[in-house]
Amino acid sequence: HPGSASPATTTLPNMNLAAWEALAEAGDVINGNYAPADGATLGPKKIIGNLTLGNGVDVTVTGVIWVLGNITTKQTSSLTVDPVFGANSTWIIADDPADQATKGKITIENGTTISGSGHLQSHLWFISTNTSTDEASPAITVDNTAYGAIFSAHNGVVRLKNNANVKAVTGKRLYLDQNAEVNYETSEFIDSNFSGSPSGSWGIKSETWQEIP
């Protein structure tokens, strides 16, 4: 908030990408670019290509999604965590280990709706491993309010464009356009669980990612 003291710097938490990507790969593998149909369910899934949500396409996320390309959501599309997740959350990962310089970008266009399962502590966590720190070509671009989303780009820049408003964001750099906001609701992240499926979960504990049996 304006006029308040700057928070102390802290080390970004480690992310167990290998384990989370293994969960996605264990579900199913799609070779090539993928554009789901309206009303589709998606996950756990590994996509060897780009993932694009077209205009007006609504998708229910049913597990971890790992994309070895770029992720783009078009206007009036939506991503919603399956209600059966309850208080659990899950991941959408953009990561090509062989090309993190040009691939692994995430673009959330204006008009996209991102929601958890309907439970206060349910979120959709977007992770980019792209290494761009240039705000003109960011690792993650968010051009819309995304109350149910967390965005992470620990090796790149996250750009929040005009009027973007997100739940939480972490990155090597954060670039905010005019009227963009980050509103941390601490109570919603205490003991939050992230799941590859509704039956298994990971928890946030003291700034580390810890598996919970």
Task: Label each PLM-derived region with a short phrase.
Residues 1-35:
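Beta-strand-rich assembly/attachment modules of structural machines
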Residues 198-213:
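Short, low-complexity, Pro/Ser/Thr/Gly-rich segments in the mature regions of secreted, periplasmic
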Residues 12-14, 84, 118-119, 195, ...:
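Intrinsically disordered, low-complexity regions enriched in Ser/Pro/Gly/Gln/His and often acidic
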Residues 179-200:
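Low-complexity, intrinsically disordered Gly/Pro/Thr-rich segments
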Residues 21-184:
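Long, polar low-complexity repeats
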